[in-house]
Regions:
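Residues immediately within or flanking Cys/His clusters that coordinate Zn2+
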Residues: 63-66, 70-72, 83, 289
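Short, cysteine/histidine-rich loop/knuckle motifs that typically chelate Zn2+
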Residues: 68-71, 88, 294
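Acidic, metal-ligating active-site segments
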Residues: 156-157, 161, 165-166, 171-225, ...
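Terminal interaction-prone segments of large eukaryotic proteins
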Residues: 296-297, 395, 403-641
């Protein structure tokens, strides 16, 4: 017997759910689903149209459609609700001589799904992890996001909604839910001509070993392309409305105590790559005059370029009024200062003043997410470790070593590798990857011929387990190998499952030294004869040379904020984008119809979310998975016990 509250499923409804789960799991088209009526006559199979209506009723939620620009510039919510054309590109909202919309964003409400989670007795018990962790956590040891300073500060902070304090603190009830939100852009095709942007929520009340499983991730919708949004807040509007409701509290049923209570949820962290965080915080971006969203370091524009670079050492850089920055004492952005500057831009009296202030502050206006009292700007928006390190830092180092990093001179540099040497490294790395157990990560392809197959995970496997061996003795100057080995040691430290606070301080200081060495130039040394001379032994990539300014992108500077982000938000694996990458890969694999691309993507996101909801509401997790549950335990061989 399967039931939700007083609602009991009939045999016919259960058969309908199995059929629906079969369609979602095997990515059947609507035409293929309808053909089942012909292939299996007499089995009382309904058409897809009838089935989808039943599924909406049984799951307890359906997508809410919001009109949006056909280029996804804006979504017609909030201030744009009554617009008939896009305020950015001018394209019409509706088709000619019709009230039929041209494009839409299918938002998936999160409140019904959070209520289903706490109503499911099995999951509700797992969600006690957060409150139990508070009681059992050890002082001075960091093991989860709840050891971060931001979460701890919320425990003694009254909930504020629309400028008014409510008479209770954040997480005052053991059932209050800690949430994280993640956004990323994904290219649907290899040519990267069309993109879409999934919005996901993570339930941090679940234990770390299950919280990022696909069936526990909460999709809030997929923003259609073909371009990235210009006004991200217009797409966030329905989500923020629900998050404000959840701060106040919504009525829910406790599956353990069998009582009705007021469910609250609070957003702890926002996860995304640099472009995504730029949109979510309404900042100018990584090419702005002040490109870092964590501190106020001033960028330096390279000649014949509109891009600003951020070396610590600004001396001898034309047009720069800043001296060398102290990496241990950077001019950090604080919440009150950020909001004050955003207000100045938002309410500037003239357009010219608004543009000047936006350029000076690097902020375009007040972000909609600032209406949530649980977020701190910019501390709640850490640099994503996955994108920062595996998809940018390591790739850039490889481009240096192969002489392909931008328009810099690489000939004669001690880090430069001959083509034959690099080809040999790539070939042996791919062969070595065949012998690495899959538990360590995915296969590493031949990077010289199959670089397009490289993912963040394969970069990680190569960096941590293969590169330290493959690169030994390859550089003409050994200092570059030692510099890389120091980085690998640091990355392994960041990936530990628990950290003493002393190690967090070590991470901060070690990244400071690594970045300083990355920028370092020749230094003057005293010879035995008492004569000052210049030594090249300490010259690395930037070399304090204006002609090499391109060697200092934001992704190098961002390493200086990894340690402080761990202090604020917990260990890097608690808020990185790997779960988002897995979801994006799942979306791309389910693309079937190129003509109705975004309709198909929305339909898949909706169907998979409804299937997860049905499993929760009627306790059908095993039955609707057809026995193919995730098994992370693996097999333990007798000789390894």
């Amino acid at each position: 017997m399967h039931q939700s509250g007083s609602r009991t499923l009939s045999k016919e409804e259960l058969a309908l759910l199995r059929l629906f789960a079969f369609k979602v799991k095997h990515n059947l088209t609507e035409a293929a689903f309808n053909d089942l009526l012909i292939a299996f006559p007499g089995n009382d199979i309904s058409s897809w149209q009838v089935t989808s209506r039943h599924i909406q009723c049984l799951s307890g939620f359906k997508p809410v459609r919001y009109d949006c620009c056909p280029d996804s510039c804006v979504c017609y919510t909030g201030p744009y609700e009554k617009y008939d054309a896009c305020p950015v590109c001018g394209k019409a909202r509706y088709k000619p001589n019709s009230t039929q919309l041209r494009s839409y964003f299918a938002y998936l409400p999160i409140i019904p799904r959070l209520c289903a989670m706490v109503a499911n007795s099995r999951l509700a018990k797992e969600m006690h992890y957060r409150s139990q962790y508070e009681d059992e956590s050890q002082e001075g040891i960091m093991e989860d996001i709840f050891d971060g300073d931001l979460y701890k500060s919320l425990l003694n902070k009254l909930i504020m909604v629309v400028g008014k304090n409510l008479p209770f603190h954040h997480f005052s009830d053991h059932r209050d839910i800690a949430l994280g939100v993640s956004m990323d852009g994904v290219s649907v095709f290899k040519k990267r001509s069309k993109t879409c942007s999934p919005l996901l929520l993570f339930n941090y009340n679940l234990p770390p070993d299950t919280r990022f499983h696909m069936n526990n991730i909460i999709p809030a919708g997929i923003i259609p392309g073909p371009k990235k949004p210009v006004d991200m807040d217009s797409f966030l509007h329905p989500l923020v409305q629900e998050l404000v409701q959840l701060e106040i509290g919504v009525t829910a049923f406790d599956g353990l105590s069998k009582t009705v209570f007021l469910l609250r949820a609070h957003l702890l962290v926002v996860i995304g790559d640099i472009p995504a965080v730029t949109l979510l915080m309404r900042m100018k971006g990584h090419n702005g005059f002040s490109p870092c969203h964590m501190c106020k370091i001033v960028g330096v524009k390279a000649s014949l370029s509109n891009t600003y670079y951020v070396p610590l050492h600004h001396r001898n850089v034309s047009g720069s009024s800043s001296g060398p920055y102290d990496p241990s004492n950077l001019p950090m952005c604080m919440h009150n200062g950020f909001i004050d500057e955003a207000n100045q831009v938002q309410f500037a009296r003239t357009l010219t003043l608004e543009q000047n202030l936006a350029t000076e502050f690097g902020i375009k206006g007040i972000p909609l997410l600032s209406s949530l009292g649980s977020l701190s700007f910019p501390a709640s928006f850490p640099y994503d470790f996955m994108h920062l390190v595996w998809e940018n830092l390591i790739l850039n180092l490889v481009l240096f070593w192969t002489g392909c990093f931008k328009e810099l001179r690489h000939e004669g540099m001690g880090y430069s590798l001959d083509d034959s040497v690099w080809t040999d490294i790539c070939c042996i790395s791919a062969e070595a990857s065949d012998t690495i157990p899959a538990a360590f990560g995915c296969h590493v392809p031949d990077m010289s011929t199959q670089r397009w197959q490289l993912t963040a995970e394969s970069w990680e496997v190569w960096t941590l387990y293969i590169a330290p061996i493959m690169l030994y003795g390859r550089f003409t100057e050994e200092k570059y190998y030692k510099h890389f080995r120091r980085l690998v040691h640091l990355l392994k430290l960041c990936l530990e499952y628990e950290l003493l606070m002393e190690k967090v301080a070590k991470i901060e200081n070690s990244f400071i030294r690594w970045v300083e060495d990355y920028e370092r130039s020749v230094i003057k040394v005293m010879t035995l004869n008492g004569v000052l001379t210049c030594s090249n032994a300490f010259r690395f990539y930037y070399q304090h040379n204006i002609s090499r300014l391109l060697a200092c992108p934001l992704t190098i500077h961002a390493l200086l904020h990894v340690g402080s982000s761990i202090r604020a938000n917990g260990l890097v694996w608690t808020n990185w984008a790997f779960p988002m990458e897995r979801y994006c890969g799942d979306v791309v694999r389910h693309v079937r119809n190129r003509h109705y691309l975004y309709i198909g993507i929305n339909n898949y996101a909706t169907s998979s979310a409804q299937l997860a909801q049905l499993k929760l509401r009627y306790d059908l997790d095993e039955e609707l998975s057809f026995g193919s549950q995730d098994n992370d335990a693996g097999h333990i061989y007798d000789g390894c016990k």
